Regions:
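Class I SAM-dependent methyltransferase SAM/SAH-binding core
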Residues: 43-45, 52-97
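Acceptor-substrate binding/catalytic loop of class I
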Residues: 150-167, 191-195, 199
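A short, conserved alpha-helix within the catalytic core of class I
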Residues: 116-129
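Conserved class I S-adenosyl-L-methionine
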Residues: 1-39, 147
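A short acidic, Gly/Pro-enriched loop at the edge of an enzyme's catalytic core
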Residues: 99-108
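Short alpha-helix
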Residues: 160-180
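Conserved beta-strand signature within the Rossmann-like core of class I S-adenosyl-L-methionine
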Residues: 136-143
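Short "lid" loop at the C-terminus of a central beta-strand within the Rossmann-like core
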Residues: 116, 143-149, 184-185
Length: 208
């Protein structure tokens, strides 16, 4: 059985611990690229945001952040992290299919390790993320590549959920690719993303 077939139950079980399983610190790739390409006051959507580490960091930079996740426990922990950090984030309980994807809504969409999606769902999700960006809006994404199956230091063990350069180029066709990097790096993001990792990072800008 695919562990993602009941996503809410799967993620509620994973998040059912006092610890922040991916840590409280924002993803390194996001911090680097947001500093370069996002401005204070930008409207940002964080997709499948989990326990809030990325949305809270963006709010600390002065951005207006909406974030959703399908796990009630993740939302509760994210709200607490925002409260502890003295920032405001608009958290909503939703899946990637039930979220209200309004067109031309955001200056940026942030998608960090959203590899719960099989190829069919992934194509649908990327189309929605691009649609909800304003013209000249920026998509910042990080995920694992197939080599991650050798490292086993985080992410799904399902090959078709992982990213390649070619897959991502096809999915963001029509956008201007600012950065598309495939690389290896030691991660230290809580207990679930720890050790040498095979990564892909993307920054792309909507043209229309």
């Amino acid at each position: 059985m695919d562990v993602f077939s009941d996503g809410a139950e799967f993620w509620n079980q994973r998040f059912n611990t006092p610890d922040y399983i991916f840590g409280r610190t924002a993803n390194d790739y996001l911090r680097e690229k947001a500093t370069l390409y996002l401005a204070e006051g930008s409207t940002v959507l964080c997709v499948a945001d989990g326990e809030g580490r990325n949305s809270v960091w963006l709010a600390k930079q002065g951005m207006q952040v909406d974030a959703f996740d399908l796990s009630t426990l993740a939302i509760t922990k994210a709200k607490q992290l925002a409260l502890d950090s003295e920032v405001q984030v608009n958290y909503l309980l939703a899946s990637s299919d039930s979220w209200d994807w309004r067109p031309n809504q955001y200056d940026a969409v942030v998608a960090i390790f959203i590899q719960f999606a099989d190829p069919t769902m992934r194509a649908r999700l990327f189309a929605k993320m691009m649609s909800t960006l304003k013209p000249r809006g920026v998509l910042i994404l990080q995920g694992y590549t197939p080599k991650q199956l050798e490292y086993k230091t985080g992410g799904p063990s399902i090959l078709e959920h992982l990213y390649t350069d070619g897959i991502i180029r096809d999915l963001v066709g029509g956008m201007d690719i600012i950065d598309l990097s495939v690389y290896e790096k030691v991660l230290s993001e809580g207990s679930k993303h720890t050790g040498m990792s095979a990564l892909l990072g993307l920054v792309a800008r909507k043209t229309l």
